[in-house]
Design a protein with these regions (language model features):
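Transmembrane beta-strands of outer-membrane beta-barrel pores
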Residues: 48-54, 72-74, 98-104, 132-134, ...
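Solvent-exposed loop/turn segments connecting transmembrane beta-strands
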Residues: 53-60, 118-120, 142-152, 208
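Outer-envelope beta-barrel architecture signal
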Residues: 36-44, 60-64, 76, 88-94, ...
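Residues on the lipid-exposed face of transmembrane beta-strands in outer-membrane beta-barrel proteins
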Residues: 46-50, 66-72, 82-87, 126-130, ...
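Bacterial N-terminal signal peptides
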Residues: 7-17
């Protein structure tokens, strides 16, 4: 059922006009008056984050945080978004979506002894968002091109407050969905694994809404090229993700913190 819903959502995205389909992360609308020449702009983020060691864990690790956000693209008379870093692009548009999920080496955790290891995963996909000056709503759809090879999705919303023209504060809810194979990969326990473990019961995890939470973020623009960005997240594991023996040995409350520098790059070609 979940795969069918995601497939329909993907079909709707594909059916959008081809101009909109070229939009990437945070690229909204089509620029009505493109500048002469070819231009492209995007923002890279690099920093550190604190996150659970694996989904359902009550232990945390510090690791790198990377991000990408699309700004604008102009080719001849055709344009999407805008290279202007001060412009708040509004309306309905597509955006890119990606997420990295680290590996799980079960031998490193006493509670997971006997379970199969889980490879790290890179999820790539697209999202549809509607944005205004004071808020946005969005839905993202991704596929694990490495690792779990499952469809996952996220829906959410944000409200924006801008105390100054350089500082943007945001806050909003998030709900994460995944299909059965993802849920089984991270939260399931096969009979063979349960036998090897000696402490965990067999558990067949099903997909659906696996977590719900909130993200509170801040962006500060140092100048036209550089900025500082951070966020605090909280997610509560739901459904079989929350009922899993793996989670019961850890925690269904999942926290995260990230902070990093952003660099906006604009170039002609």
């Amino acid at each position: 059922m979940f795969r069918t819903v995601l497939a329909l959502a993907a079909g709707l995205l594909v059916a959008l006009p081809s101009g909109a389909a070229l939009a990437q992360a945070d690229g909204f609308g089509v620029a009505p008056q493109p500048r002469p020449g070819n231009l492209a702009s995007f923002t890279l983020r690099g920093g550190v984050q604190v996150r659970p060691e694996f989904p359902g864990s009550d232990e945390y690790e510090v690791g790198p945080d990377l991000g990408f956000r699309f700004g604008g693209l102009e080719i001849g008379r055709f344009g999407i978004g805008d290279p202007d870093p001060e412009l708040v692009q509004t309306g309905l548009g597509l955006r890119g979506s990606f997420r990295y999920v680290g590996e799980r080496d079960s031998s490193e955790f006493e509670d997971l002894r006997g379970l199969d290891d889980v490879d790290d995963a890179l999820e790539l996909g697209v999202g549809l968002a509607y944005r205004q000056d004071a808020y946005q709503v969005f839905g993202d759809l991704r596929y694990g091109v490495t690792g779990h090879e499952a469809l996952v999705g996220e829906i959410g919303a944000d409200v924006f407050v801008r105390p100054t023209n350089r500082l943007t504060l945001s806050a909003g809810p998030r709900v994460f969905f995944a299909e059965d194979s993802y849920a089984q990969e991270y939260f399931g326990v096969s009979p063979a694994e349960a036998l090897r473990s000696g402490s965990l019961e067999p558990f067949e995890a099903e997909g659906g809404a696996l977590s719900a939470g909130i993200e509170i973020g801040a962006q500060y623009r140092l100048n036209d090229s550089w900025g500082i960005e951070g966020a605090v997240t909280y997610d509560r594991l739901l459904g079989d993700a929350g009922d899993s023996p793996i989670t019961e040995a850890g925690s269904d409350d999942q926290y995260g913190v990230r902070v990093g520098l952003t660099r906006r790059i604009t170039f002609g070609f």
